Amino acid sequence: MRLPPLQAAKFIRRYKRFMADVELANGNILTIHCANTGAMTGCAEKGDTVWYSDSKSTTRKYPCSWELTELSNGNLVCINTHRSNQLVQEALQNKVIKELAGYSEIYPEVKYGEENSRIDFLLKGEGLPDCYVEVKSITLVKNNIGMFPDAVTTRGQKHVRELLAMKKQGYRAVVLFAGLHNGFDCFKTAEYIDPDYDKLLRQAMKEGVEVYAYAGKFDKIQEIPTALSLAEVVPLCFN
Protein backbone atom coordinates (compact mmCIF):
# COMPACT_ATOMS: atom_id res chain seq x y z
CA MET A 1 0.00 0.00 0.00
CA ARG A 2 1.47 3.29 -1.07
CA LEU A 3 1.57 5.92 1.63
CA PRO A 4 0.87 9.56 0.84
CA PRO A 5 3.89 11.89 0.74
CA LEU A 6 5.07 12.26 4.32
CA GLN A 7 6.81 14.96 6.32
CA ALA A 8 8.52 14.59 9.69
CA ALA A 9 7.91 16.43 12.95
CA LYS A 10 8.39 15.89 16.69
CA PHE A 11 5.42 14.79 18.77
CA ILE A 12 4.38 17.12 21.59
CA ARG A 13 0.91 16.07 22.74
CA ARG A 14 -2.38 14.49 21.75
CA TYR A 15 -5.68 15.90 23.00
CA LYS A 16 -9.45 15.94 22.36
CA ARG A 17 -8.98 12.45 20.86
CA PHE A 18 -8.65 13.72 17.29
CA MET A 19 -5.94 16.38 17.58
CA ALA A 20 -2.19 16.44 18.12
CA ASP A 21 0.45 19.15 18.31
CA VAL A 22 3.81 18.56 16.64
CA GLU A 23 6.96 20.64 16.34
CA LEU A 24 8.33 21.29 12.86
CA ALA A 25 12.01 21.53 11.99
CA ASN A 26 11.80 25.34 12.03
CA GLY A 27 10.39 25.30 15.57
CA ASN A 28 6.82 26.14 14.58
CA ILE A 29 3.97 24.22 16.21
CA LEU A 30 1.46 22.52 13.91
CA THR A 31 -1.88 21.00 14.94
CA ILE A 32 -2.69 17.85 12.95
CA HIS A 33 -5.64 15.47 12.80
CA CYS A 34 -5.38 12.09 14.55
CA ALA A 35 -7.66 9.40 13.08
CA ASN A 36 -6.91 6.88 15.84
CA THR A 37 -9.46 6.90 18.67
CA GLY A 38 -7.70 4.17 20.66
CA ALA A 39 -5.32 4.48 23.58
CA MET A 40 -2.28 4.48 21.23
CA THR A 41 -0.18 2.90 23.98
CA GLY A 42 3.50 3.23 23.13
CA CYS A 43 2.77 5.15 19.93
CA ALA A 44 2.58 8.69 21.28
CA GLU A 45 5.57 9.43 23.47
CA LYS A 46 6.77 13.02 23.68
CA GLY A 47 9.73 13.53 21.36
CA ASP A 48 8.89 10.65 19.02
CA THR A 49 9.12 11.35 15.32
CA VAL A 50 5.71 11.80 13.72
CA TRP A 51 5.22 11.33 9.99
CA TYR A 52 2.25 13.32 8.71
CA SER A 53 0.53 13.88 5.37
CA ASP A 54 -0.82 17.16 4.00
CA SER A 55 -4.14 16.99 2.13
CA LYS A 56 -3.69 20.59 0.88
CA SER A 57 -7.41 20.98 1.58
CA THR A 58 -8.70 24.54 1.89
CA THR A 59 -11.88 23.42 3.65
CA ARG A 60 -10.52 21.14 6.38
CA LYS A 61 -9.78 22.87 9.67
CA TYR A 62 -6.75 20.61 10.11
CA PRO A 63 -5.56 19.60 6.62
CA CYS A 64 -2.57 17.61 7.90
CA SER A 65 -3.02 14.06 9.23
CA TRP A 66 -0.86 11.94 11.53
CA GLU A 67 0.06 8.78 9.62
CA LEU A 68 3.03 7.08 11.35
CA THR A 69 5.10 7.22 14.49
CA GLU A 70 8.80 6.37 14.38
CA LEU A 71 9.68 5.03 17.81
CA SER A 72 12.92 5.61 19.68
CA ASN A 73 14.11 2.10 18.73
CA GLY A 74 13.57 2.80 15.02
CA ASN A 75 10.39 0.77 14.61
CA LEU A 76 7.50 2.27 12.69
CA VAL A 77 3.80 2.08 13.48
CA CYS A 78 0.94 3.33 11.33
CA ILE A 79 -1.44 5.00 13.77
CA ASN A 80 -3.99 5.85 11.07
CA THR A 81 -6.10 2.73 11.56
CA HIS A 82 -8.40 3.82 8.73
CA ARG A 83 -5.68 2.45 6.46
CA SER A 84 -5.88 -1.11 7.82
CA ASN A 85 -8.76 -2.18 5.57
CA GLN A 86 -7.03 -0.68 2.54
CA LEU A 87 -3.91 -2.64 3.48
CA VAL A 88 -5.82 -5.91 3.86
CA GLN A 89 -7.85 -5.45 0.68
CA GLU A 90 -4.63 -5.02 -1.28
CA ALA A 91 -3.20 -8.15 0.37
CA LEU A 92 -6.34 -10.14 -0.48
CA GLN A 93 -6.25 -9.00 -4.09
CA ASN A 94 -2.58 -9.93 -4.39
CA LYS A 95 -3.10 -13.33 -2.69
CA VAL A 96 -0.64 -12.45 0.06
CA ILE A 97 -2.86 -13.98 2.74
CA LYS A 98 -2.37 -17.63 1.83
CA GLU A 99 -5.11 -18.88 4.14
CA LEU A 100 -7.64 -16.92 2.06
CA ALA A 101 -6.04 -17.09 -1.37
CA GLY A 102 -8.67 -19.44 -2.85
CA TYR A 103 -11.38 -16.78 -2.96
CA SER A 104 -11.94 -14.82 -6.15
CA GLU A 105 -14.58 -12.31 -5.04
CA ILE A 106 -14.04 -9.66 -2.37
CA TYR A 107 -16.93 -7.61 -0.99
CA PRO A 108 -16.09 -4.90 1.57
CA GLU A 109 -18.38 -3.56 4.29
CA VAL A 110 -21.27 -6.03 4.02
CA LYS A 111 -24.11 -5.93 6.56
CA TYR A 112 -24.56 -9.16 8.50
CA GLY A 113 -25.38 -10.70 11.85
CA GLU A 114 -27.93 -10.11 14.55
CA GLU A 115 -26.26 -7.12 16.24
CA ASN A 116 -26.41 -4.64 13.34
CA SER A 117 -22.83 -5.27 12.23
CA ARG A 118 -20.83 -4.82 9.05
CA ILE A 119 -18.16 -7.35 8.17
CA ASP A 120 -14.96 -5.83 6.81
CA PHE A 121 -14.77 -8.35 3.96
CA LEU A 122 -17.06 -11.07 2.67
CA LEU A 123 -15.16 -13.49 0.42
CA LYS A 124 -16.77 -15.78 -2.12
CA GLY A 125 -15.30 -18.47 -4.35
CA GLU A 126 -16.59 -21.31 -6.47
CA GLY A 127 -17.05 -24.44 -4.38
CA LEU A 128 -16.03 -22.68 -1.18
CA PRO A 129 -18.09 -21.62 1.83
CA ASP A 130 -18.56 -17.88 2.16
CA CYS A 131 -15.86 -16.42 4.38
CA TYR A 132 -16.47 -13.54 6.81
CA VAL A 133 -13.29 -11.61 7.61
CA GLU A 134 -13.04 -9.10 10.45
CA VAL A 135 -9.90 -6.93 10.41
CA LYS A 136 -8.23 -5.65 13.57
CA SER A 137 -5.12 -3.47 13.72
CA ILE A 138 -1.97 -4.33 15.67
CA THR A 139 -0.37 -1.14 16.98
CA LEU A 140 0.41 -2.30 20.53
CA VAL A 141 3.73 -4.14 20.86
CA LYS A 142 5.61 -5.17 24.01
CA ASN A 143 8.73 -7.35 24.10
CA ASN A 144 8.36 -8.11 20.38
CA ILE A 145 4.82 -9.42 20.95
CA GLY A 146 2.00 -7.81 18.98
CA MET A 147 -1.21 -7.43 20.96
CA PHE A 148 -4.84 -6.39 20.60
CA PRO A 149 -6.72 -4.46 21.87
CA ASP A 150 -4.99 -1.41 23.33
CA ALA A 151 -8.20 -0.40 25.15
CA VAL A 152 -11.40 -2.15 26.20
CA THR A 153 -13.39 -2.83 23.02
CA THR A 154 -17.07 -3.67 23.37
CA ARG A 155 -17.30 -3.32 19.60
CA GLY A 156 -14.58 -5.93 19.16
CA GLN A 157 -16.41 -8.24 21.55
CA LYS A 158 -19.57 -7.86 19.47
CA HIS A 159 -17.66 -8.77 16.31
CA VAL A 160 -16.37 -11.99 17.87
CA ARG A 161 -19.92 -12.97 18.85
CA GLU A 162 -21.16 -12.26 15.33
CA LEU A 163 -18.36 -14.31 13.75
CA LEU A 164 -19.02 -17.24 16.04
CA ALA A 165 -22.68 -17.17 15.01
CA MET A 166 -21.69 -17.24 11.33
CA LYS A 167 -19.36 -20.17 11.98
CA LYS A 168 -22.20 -22.08 13.62
CA GLN A 169 -24.24 -21.51 10.45
CA GLY A 170 -21.59 -23.29 8.38
CA TYR A 171 -19.58 -20.37 7.02
CA ARG A 172 -15.89 -19.61 7.48
CA ALA A 173 -15.25 -16.91 10.06
CA VAL A 174 -11.87 -15.21 10.37
CA VAL A 175 -10.35 -12.55 12.60
CA LEU A 176 -7.36 -11.11 10.75
CA PHE A 177 -4.96 -9.08 12.88
CA ALA A 178 -3.11 -6.75 10.53
CA GLY A 179 0.30 -5.51 11.58
CA LEU A 180 0.52 -1.74 11.39
CA HIS A 181 3.74 -2.10 13.42
CA ASN A 182 6.98 -3.71 12.22
CA GLY A 183 8.41 -4.69 15.60
CA PHE A 184 6.73 -7.98 16.54
CA ASP A 185 7.21 -11.65 15.68
CA CYS A 186 4.23 -13.28 17.42
CA PHE A 187 0.73 -12.26 18.49
CA LYS A 188 -1.59 -12.60 21.49
CA THR A 189 -4.58 -10.85 22.97
CA ALA A 190 -3.94 -8.15 25.56
CA GLU A 191 -5.90 -9.97 28.24
CA TYR A 192 -4.67 -7.54 30.92
CA ILE A 193 -6.44 -4.73 29.05
CA ASP A 194 -9.67 -6.46 27.99
CA PRO A 195 -10.14 -9.86 29.64
CA ASP A 196 -13.65 -10.19 28.19
CA TYR A 197 -12.33 -9.89 24.63
CA ASP A 198 -9.61 -12.41 25.42
CA LYS A 199 -12.14 -14.88 26.81
CA LEU A 200 -14.53 -14.45 23.88
CA LEU A 201 -11.83 -14.89 21.26
CA ARG A 202 -10.38 -17.99 22.92
CA GLN A 203 -13.83 -19.57 23.06
CA ALA A 204 -14.51 -18.65 19.44
CA MET A 205 -11.23 -20.25 18.38
CA LYS A 206 -12.19 -23.46 20.16
CA GLU A 207 -15.43 -23.46 18.19
CA GLY A 208 -13.78 -22.98 14.81
CA VAL A 209 -13.33 -19.25 14.28
CA GLU A 210 -9.96 -18.82 12.55
CA VAL A 211 -7.40 -16.30 13.80
CA TYR A 212 -4.40 -15.12 11.80
CA ALA A 213 -1.88 -12.36 12.50
CA TYR A 214 0.34 -10.82 9.85
CA ALA A 215 3.44 -8.72 10.41
CA GLY A 216 3.76 -5.32 8.82
CA LYS A 217 6.61 -4.22 6.54
CA PHE A 218 7.51 -0.64 5.69
CA ASP A 219 9.42 0.46 2.60
CA LYS A 220 11.52 3.62 2.61
CA ILE A 221 13.11 5.86 0.03
CA GLN A 222 15.91 8.06 1.39
CA GLU A 223 14.79 7.24 4.96
CA ILE A 224 11.23 8.46 4.29
CA PRO A 225 8.50 5.79 4.65
CA THR A 226 6.72 5.29 1.34
CA ALA A 227 4.71 2.05 1.60
CA LEU A 228 3.25 -0.46 4.04
CA SER A 229 2.45 -4.09 3.28
CA LEU A 230 1.59 -7.30 5.10
CA ALA A 231 4.74 -9.39 5.14
CA GLU A 232 4.07 -12.85 6.55
CA VAL A 233 1.92 -14.69 9.02
CA VAL A 234 3.32 -14.81 12.56
CA PRO A 235 2.64 -17.48 15.20
CA LEU A 236 0.08 -17.03 17.93
CA CYS A 237 1.58 -16.97 21.42
CA PHE A 238 -1.43 -17.09 23.72
CA ASN A 239 -0.59 -18.16 27.27
Swiss-Prot record:
GO terms for molecular function: DNA binding. Transmembrane segments: none annotated. It holds the Pfam family SfsA_N. Gene3D superfamilies: 2.40.50.580, 3.40.1350.60. Belongs to the SfsA family. HAMAP family: SfsA. This is Sugar fermentation stimulation protein homolog. It comes from Mannheimia succiniciproducens (strain KCTC 0769BP / MBEL55E).
